């Protein structure tokens, strides 16, 4: 399980929205993880912290300077590749659904095998049945959320209709994403000061 270093939420498994900006480099973007500067048509089409995809390679944007993106190559289980000039760049929805601040550091996360049931027959023999395997879970506690961040979490809650639809959560700044659902049936905020809120969010991994 990835340690919590930076939380991102998105509604799609991979960047799928056409950014309308293409790669704008002489030659190509080399097949090398040490090549981390990506020049695009318009840097304002992107946000630091979000993930992008060129061909089948997913990248994480660390920072933006004008039309140059500084990225981490080959994240979320993808492989580094060569990308020709003018290739389309796709972006994820994480800027829409990720608060500007991370949760407090007292984050609970666990691994369980609750999908395995155990029964014991007469005579003492034990039988097991695996309905599903390992499942990860997180509990994120936010304090000092500004109104805009509260609205972002409410937008995510409404986009997936509470517990109805799964979405994607990264605990490590977009390097790894997990398919998850909300654990609770309602999203509750407590106003602790003027325009300041707190909430706790439980997430459980979607397993097959």
Could you tell me what each predicted segment is?
Residues 1-20, 76, 82, 88-208:
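Extracellular/virion structural assembly segments
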Residues 3-5, 9-93:
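Autoprocessing Asn-cyclization modules and mimics
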